[in-house]
Amino acid sequence: QVMTVSTIKELASDLSKKEINTLLIEYEATFPFQKHATLCNQLAFSRSEVQDIVSYCTSLGIEVIPLQNCFGHCEYILRHDRYAHLREDSKEVSQVCPLKIEEAKKVFREIFREVAELHPSPYFHIGADETYLLGSCAQCSQVNKSRLFVDYIKAMCEVVKEMGKKPIIWADIILMHPEAVQELPKDLIYVDWNYG
């Protein structure tokens, strides 16, 4: 279910009263992409609506951090033929193949920049949770899963840092591969969560 601008503002107002100062927004297909307009669904916000949300939150002392998935949870991207070359699996279109680093960087550099343009926060969340298809494709099956994860996340962090932003990821997958944490950027921020 997509929240309306007014509903998000009501939520922000409630958060402000509770002295909460950060709101993470995952837009998916409701972000008003321009170069990648194929991704927008019929409920997509306009650019001015996103600016209105961010401005309102800022006026309440709430920082809006955008979450733009680039690894798992990319169904709304990978279902389109234009992005089919990035799929980890031809039938299950939820995850980007971590060996397609250069192709993915090209696409997500553009997507990240569009999202970042409307969010002054120094932080940029790239998701990376529930990448359960790691090692599914024939090429990936020959590579260690933690290696696949680390190399891909390092590449996406580079793209985030090119914009002058600090990257954030969910911590669930790296907690399954704790041996790999030393290889990830030292300034990468991990957000832990559970299924409650």
Please name every model-derived segment.
Residues 180-196:
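Aromatic- and acid-rich polysaccharide-binding/catalytic face
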Residues 112, 175-178:
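A generic local structural motif
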